[in-house]
Amino acid sequence: MDFDEILHHVGDSGRFQICMIILLNILSLVLSPHDVLENFTAAIPAHHCSINLDNSRSEVSTDMNLTTEDLMKVSIPMGPNQKPEQCRRFRYTQWQFLDSNISTFNSTELETEPCLDGWTYDHSVFTSTIVTEWDLVCDFQSFKYYAQATSLAGHLVSCPLSGIISDRFGRKPLLMYCSLAYGAVGTYCAFAPNFSVYCVLRFLLSAFQSTILINSLILVLEEASVQWHPTIIVLSGLFNSIGQGVLGGLAYVISDWHLLQLAYALPFFIFFVLFCWVPESVRWLIITGKTDQAWKELQRIASINGKKGIAQNLTTEDLRSKLKKDVNSTGKLFRIKDIFINPLIRKIVLSNSSLLFAELFSFVGLLLDVQLLGKNMFLTQIFLGAIDVPSKSLTYFTIRNVSRRPLIAFLLLTTGSCITITIFISEEMYVLRTIIFILGKGCFAAFTCISTTYINELSPVELRSTLNGVFLAVVRLAGVLSALTLATRKYFVYLPMILYGVLPIVATISILFLPETFNLPHTDIIKDMEKRKRLMSKNISKKEGQDFLETTEC
């Protein structure tokens, strides 16, 4: 009796699995906004230098009734866009600007200075953000993007570590303690005393977020029937997108960054309690030899699924038999360096990494700063989340009917073109800019689904998890560098957009070095990949080709 048969006896698609899927989707809904939360908690409102009139330097007494508009006129110079300068003020108060008899002044020749007394912020949209709290504007504006890069670096560190810890100690303990830690650290983050502490806490939160998302998905998949796996993955992806859309509406209601951070941190104390109830992965328990505990967990699952009587007939000997079978079927373990020894694998890793890096680099940066996309950032965030639903749904059908290489090339070219076109559209035409960005976001969402499928089709079973780890590291690195690229706006305002637009277009060349996998059998070992390559180039005998098709899975 193998594990799938054992799981079928206690129920592999019953009430327990439904509860687990619901829990996973709620987790996805709450966790998915983590990386884009700083679109709102770190939003940059309109601002100008604080006005501090110094009578000792003034030529006119200030004992008069002056409106805010008058004070701005005599204290803040106008910028090239005929709006008040955000980072400079007049060195001396220019009282002559109040004289209605004088029509024009050339304010560009007047002496200015930085904002020595701080800034005044427009609180009409956001009552508080980390930008207003720690004055992350002007010369310090790049600190916002450094904070985002630091946060994304938490994912880069946690992905390999969480996998090792999870395989060593189990899924459940990691989910329990990371949920508790996310709630505690997230709550403290909402009241961080300074910017440095805030960055460290966001780094930790990202590490916990990745760990929870990855291990919760693994736990649910390991406890469910294989036929449920596509549905589970698609639902998780859709709730990810819905969660990002919900963030736009929630941020509109909660305009204080402290409260918004708390709103996403406090639910994890509830998740901690729920994970205390969730059984450990039976599959992991069997593989690690904990058959007695696995038997107890199977009894719980059977009871929830209404099959308690059937489960009573299951003995620990059945589980030990399954364990023995798994141990005997274990083959050679591959190391990371083995990927780069084989030229075929090496070419796949390098080419596919360039595609993933380009696409993720181009759009992650934009998702981290939706203020670039249009005037109403709340609606933009909602639309960016909503567009994923039809996009990912449509992708399900294109995967079944369209070749991989031309589809991926089309998505890369469209994404890069959408970003590049917006450079030439003025900010006043924000509706058109938003529509084009949403089209690009739809292509990005489709790319994430199709690339996941393509990676699994390219990778042999014996190397699949290792290659996925390599590609995941590339994706996280792209996110970190994408956030840092936003800081280059202070040198040339269009530089991030140029890089985001050009890179996917250039990276399309890499698709030429990858094989087509549509309607071809999946491979189990590297030798199967080499046979598949020869089959496509017709450099293989008829008998070898027939053997290959018979011995590989479709």
Swiss-Prot record:
InterPro entries: MFS, MFS_dom, MFS_trans_sf, Sugar_transporter_CS
Keywords: Cell membrane, Glycoprotein, Ion transport, Membrane, Transmembrane, Transmembrane helix, Transport
Glycosylation sites: N39, N194
UniProt record similarity statement: Belongs to the major facilitator (TC 2.A.1) superfamily. Organic cation transporter (TC 2.A.1.19) family.
GO molecular function, one term: transmembrane transporter activity
GO biological process: monoatomic ion transport; sodium-independent prostaglandin transport
Protein name: Solute carrier family 22 member 22
Tissues and organs where the protein is expressed, per its UniProt entry: Specifically expressed in kidney where it is found in proximal convoluted tubules (at protein level). Colocalizes with the prostaglandin-inactivating enzyme HPGD in kidney (at protein level). Not detected in other tissues tested.
The UniProt record lists the keyword Oxidoreductase: no
